[in-house]
Amino acid sequence: MQYLILSLIFLIPSLGMLTGLSIAATVLFFLLIIVITELISFIRKQEFSKKFLIKLYPRFGFDDIFCVKNRIKTELLFIAWCFISCLFTIHPINSLVTFTKVFALLFLRFVNNVVTFQNILYLKNSLILGIITAILLFFIEYSSHGFLTRMFKTHFGLYMLDRGCALLSITTWVVIIILFSNGKNINAFILYIVVLYLLSISDSLASFVGFSIGGIIFILARLIKKIFFKLITISLITGSLLFPIIAKQIDPHNLSEKYLATKPSAAHRLFIWHFVANKIIIKPILGYGFASSKYIKTSDNEMIDYRGEKLHPLPLHPHNNILQITLELGILGLALFLCLVYKYLKEIDNIKISNFRAASYSCFINYYIIGMISYNIWQTWWILSGIWILVLMKLLVKPDIIIDN
């Protein structure tokens, strides 16, 4: 079973580069294997009934259940509001199904808090090899116009590697932390430059922007560490609160013609954001309900006429996590979401080792920015990508932090 986990840690980033859609399946399988491994271990020790429940949250026992509740009360409030919003959404049944799926995945992450493994060095090496393989596979596909992809698909477009690039950009930060922990600072810098170049020639603008800003965040977190938490918190929360207002005020036609004439996909984003901002004004407090974006009706006169082409103003989701939260859950949901953002930034700031803290900030911002530009916040593969990073941090990074502290 440990060999299987070792193989998956290698395969998820490398296989994910070629077939981004497989990320959801492979990461979910990875999490289930970890849980099964731990269950088998407890059963063999005949300690399953009590210790499994205790180790769901390692620092607390049965007598401290209320402490656990208080520790995750912000998460519980957010989950409760998401559930309540399912009751008044456009399609309650569909929203409840999505709600169940999303928070079942998040609970699976919670259960994975119990996991500990021996031979961590092998797991680290497997992840590093997986990242190197993913990089090589990208350049093979890029230079050969999808030689490997066309073996099992009829055509190839560079956009097919977008999900793999997104996964690579956030997973690379875990490897950078590992390299720093081993004193290989130059190797960490080289890896960052190589991945940055890869993303710059890819079709994934969101990943490139997120990874680039992540690098800037790393430097700032090291240089001004005393005030960095306040700076990043104020910037992130203020920017998130202002974004719906900015999206309402922009002129997408004018901006698209001036700056995005050669990037139709990015231009379409501006129209989507402007449309969503106008929809938010109609139901600003409560929103339209959990996972309701793709069910919001649009009339013919709301269709976008851009360069003689008709574009949909809201195709499935807003392509921006802040706008999606505000649209679906209202200002109440956005406030709870930003409380979670503050909480997780504070937890990162509590890390004592400077390089670990800086790289963790970078990874968080990288993930946050990609979500601000591209993906549906409730998308299974994107949620699992975040869980994948958290589990890697727990398995491969946290033991080093504890030892160093």
Swiss-Prot record:
Keywords: Membrane, Transmembrane, Transmembrane helix. InterPro entries: O-antigen_ligase-rel_domated (IPR007016), WaaL-like (IPR051533). The chain crosses the membrane at residues 23-43, 77-97, 120-140, 156-178, 201-221, 227-247, 270-290, 322-342, 353-375, 377-397. Belongs to the O-antigen ligase family. It holds the Pfam family Wzy_C. This is Putative polysaccharide ligase RT0347. Coiled coil: none annotated. GO terms for cellular component: membrane.
